[in-house]
């Protein structure tokens, strides 16, 4: 249809041909009448991108020959079947979407949270303010905003607070930020915004993780702003987590940042290496396992310093030591490799490495790992190469020199490449920023898959 093609040409001038080709021209036109255009996306992520970046534009720029605005209806292949009849399209327009709570692990409690000098303050704050209120004055610090790097214990503390509050009844909503966005997009598509707002605002407390996911997402930020105001006005508890302090959030509306700072913003830091070793040595003693210092260091490294995984490994080690009648024997690195060989093999298979990052980026962009590591200066390969370097820096904390060794580049090239991607990520909103965010999420999911122990073996 001519109106849609004219709109795409206009967008090429505004956001670039490559972005239009990837996100808009790949949309399939299912049906068109004088005032309605029905599109099909390849997946829900493409729908989300459309809602965040294009929806507001079609509302003002997509018109028919009579100058009337054309309404765009978009569905995705991974959630709906193809539509060939107008009746089926109408059914999709009015479909009732699913709202669900985020998953909360009942084993994550305040009682089994490892309290250290690095996390004592956020622990005490959340524990105090998740007790049942004795009056109706609400919470003296609202919202509670936790920020710190991956592995610092934010998720455990958040879920411990949710579990504590649910013991006293009430409606406690816990969601990740990407689930909030997914719910919003579904509500917009199906015309169920009133239901969406009721779901998020008729609660006694809202816990939302990884708020930085909202960066660059105007529609999501707008809706969360009103959700926040509604809950705040009614004195409902709001707890937010992020990798960044409020002032360090990029592509986030100032009015939201201001509200995040209304209550208390508390940093939370991961365990120091010495603190982790001391804690694990104490755990081993409690389990009647004697482990030599360098053997413990080996285990910490092998299991990527994941506290929960390390505790489970010690429990499993205790059972196997007892079974083999090795109690009170000092265990060395060779003993650990023998007794936990199956665990270590799985851990190695999911360990995040530079080559693993390159493979993930290659798969995302549809190129080969060899082309990313090669010498070609074609943009088709340069961009994935730069993203790979950026992720190696962010996820593995590799030095510029080490990254240069991996990609056979000098460190100045590495620095400029990483800076280029960092700038795009900070600005937010474009396809490079979105791709990097998706890759970070998928790599984090793979890392978290270290939790692989059979429950019947480690329960004590």
UniProtKB/Swiss-Prot annotation:
Residue ranges, annotated region (Domain I, interacts with DnaA modulators): 1-68
Gene3D superfamilies: 1.10.1750.10, 3.30.300.180, P-loop containing nucleotide triphosphate hydrolases (3.40.50.300)
Compartment list: Cytoplasm
Pfam families: Bac_DnaA, Bac_DnaA_C
Residue numbers spanned by region Domain III, AAA+ region: 103-321
Region listing for Domain II, in residue ranges: 68-102
Positions with a binding annotation for ATP: 151, 153-155
Region (Domain IV, binds dsDNA): 322-460
Entry keyword set: ATP-binding, Cytoplasm, DNA replication, DNA-binding, Lipid-binding, Nucleotide-binding
Molecular function terms from GO: ATP binding; ATP hydrolysis activity; DNA replication origin binding; lipid binding
Gene Ontology annotations of biological process type: DNA replication initiation; regulation of DNA replication
Annotated PROSITE patterns: DNAA
GO cellular component entries: cytoplasm; plasma membrane
Record text on subunit structure and interactions: Oligomerizes as a right-handed, spiral filament on DNA at oriC.
HAMAP family: DnaA_bact
NCBIfam families linked to this entry: PRK12422.1 (NF009087)
Summary of the function given for this chain in its UniProt record: Plays an essential role in the initiation and regulation of chromosomal replication. ATP-DnaA binds to the origin of replication (oriC) to initiate formation of the DNA replication initiation complex once per cell cycle. Binds the DnaA box (a 9 base pair repeat at the origin) and separates the double-stranded (ds)DNA. Forms a right-handed helical filament on oriC DNA; dsDNA binds to the exterior of the filament while single-stranded (ss)DNA is stabiized in the filament's interior.
Sequence similarity: Belongs to the DnaA family.
UniProt remark on domains: Domain I is involved in oligomerization and binding regulators, domain II is flexibile and of varying length in different bacteria, domain III forms the AAA+ region, while domain IV binds dsDNA.
Protein name: Chromosomal replication initiator protein DnaA 2
Biological source species: Chlamydia caviae (strain ATCC VR-813 / DSM 19441 / 03DC25 / GPIC)
């Amino acid at each position: 249809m001519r109106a849609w093609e004219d709109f795409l040409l206009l967008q090429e001038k505004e956001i670039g041909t490559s972005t239009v080709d990837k996100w808009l021209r790949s949309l399939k036109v299912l049906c068109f009448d004088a005032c309605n255009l029905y599109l099909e996306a390849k997946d829900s992520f493409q729908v989300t991108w459309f809602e965040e970046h294009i929806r507001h534009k079609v509302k003002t720029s997509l018109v028919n020959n009579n100058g009337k605005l054309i309404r765009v209806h978009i569905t995705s292949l991974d959630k709906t079947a193809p539509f060939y009849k107008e009746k089926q399209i109408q059914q999709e327009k009015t479909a009732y979407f699913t709202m669900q709570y985020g998953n909360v692990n009942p084993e994550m409690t305040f009682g089994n949270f490892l309290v250290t000098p690095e996390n004592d303050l956020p622990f005490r704050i959340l524990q105090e303010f998740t007790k049942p209120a004795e009056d109706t004055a609400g919470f003296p610090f609202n919202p509670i905003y936790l920020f710190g790097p991956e592995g610092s214990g934010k998720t455990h503390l958040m879920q411990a607070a949710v579990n504590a509050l649910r013991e006293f009844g009430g409606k406690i909503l816990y969601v990740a930020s990407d689930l909030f966005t997914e719910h919003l997009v579904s509500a917009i598509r199906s015309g169920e915004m009133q239901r969406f707002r009721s779901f998020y605002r008729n609660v006694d407390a809202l816990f939302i993780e990884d708020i930085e996911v909202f960066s660059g997402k105007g529609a999501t930020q707008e809706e969360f702003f009103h959700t926040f105001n509604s809950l705040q006005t009614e004195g409902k508890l709001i707890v937010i987590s992020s990798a960044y302090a409020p002032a360090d959030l990029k592509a986030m509306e100032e009015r939201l940042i201001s509200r995040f700072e209304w209550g208390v913003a508390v940093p939370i830091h991961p365990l120091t290496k010495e603190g982790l070793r001391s804690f694990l040595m104490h755990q081993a003693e409690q389990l009647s396992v004697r482990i030599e210092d360098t053997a413990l260091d080996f285990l910490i490294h092998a299991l990527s310093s994941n506290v929960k995984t390390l505790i489970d490994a010690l429990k499993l080690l205790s059972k196997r030591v007892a079974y083999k009648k090795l109690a009170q024997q000092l265990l060395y690195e060779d003993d650990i490799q023998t007794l936990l060989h199956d665990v270590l093999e799985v851990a190695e298979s999911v360990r995040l490495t530079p080559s693993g990052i390159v493979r993930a980026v290659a798969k995302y962009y549809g190129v080969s790992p060899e082309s990313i590591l090669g010498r070609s200066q074609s943009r088709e390969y340069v961009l994935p190469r730069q993203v790979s370097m950026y992720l190696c820096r962010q996820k593995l904390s590799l030095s510029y020199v080490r990254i240069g060794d991996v990609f056979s580049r000098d460190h100045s090239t590495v620095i400029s490449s990483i800076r280029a991607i960092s700038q795009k990520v900070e600005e937010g909103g474009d396809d490079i920023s979105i791709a990097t965010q998706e890759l970070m999420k998928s790599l984090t999911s793979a890392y978290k898959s270290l939790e692989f122990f059979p429950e019947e073996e480690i329960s004590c």
